[in-house]
């Protein structure tokens, strides 16, 4: 999980480990665009997470000084590994800062684009160029709404009538039951 070294003006030596010597370094620096810088930054963050997990693994495996004799060789070995991981972590953070600064530098002149414009919007075929179609759709929708309101009004009236009939039947049944109870 290692990332290629970043070379360019202000970003490190032109002929470092894995770098390009001489004129090739200048062309490679020009070819690095913001998207590849973001990819390199993402890989660097992944490396940082991996190294941090290794550091925590080393710390978890270290023995606490609880009065038990500790082998000096083992202690020195683990301490050396821990220091090496911390040094590499520091280098990775510096690399991430360089990538971040370079991305901000590349994007400094760009105007911010509203997020809504970045989302592709597909319009329906009939509504692209036909204003009359929109008017007819609007008219159709208003007629449909008017019809729905009329149906709802009639439905409420019918429900009211049914409620009155049910009340009358309930009263009638109540009266019949009362008369039968008085007869017995």
From Swiss-Prot:
Signal peptide residues on this chain, from the entry's feature table: none
CC terms in the record's Gene Ontology section: mediator complex
Disulfide bonds: none
One GO term (biological process): positive regulation of DNA-templated transcription
Gene Ontology MF: a single term: transcription coregulator activity
Principal cellular location given in the protein's record: nucleus
Keyword field: Activator, Coiled coil, Nucleus, Transcription, Transcription regulation
Record bears the keyword Transmembrane helix: no
Coiled coil location: 136-179
Compartment list: Nucleus
Assembly mode: Component of the Mediator complex.
Protein name: Mediator of RNA polymerase II transcription subunit 30
Gene this chain is encoded by: med30
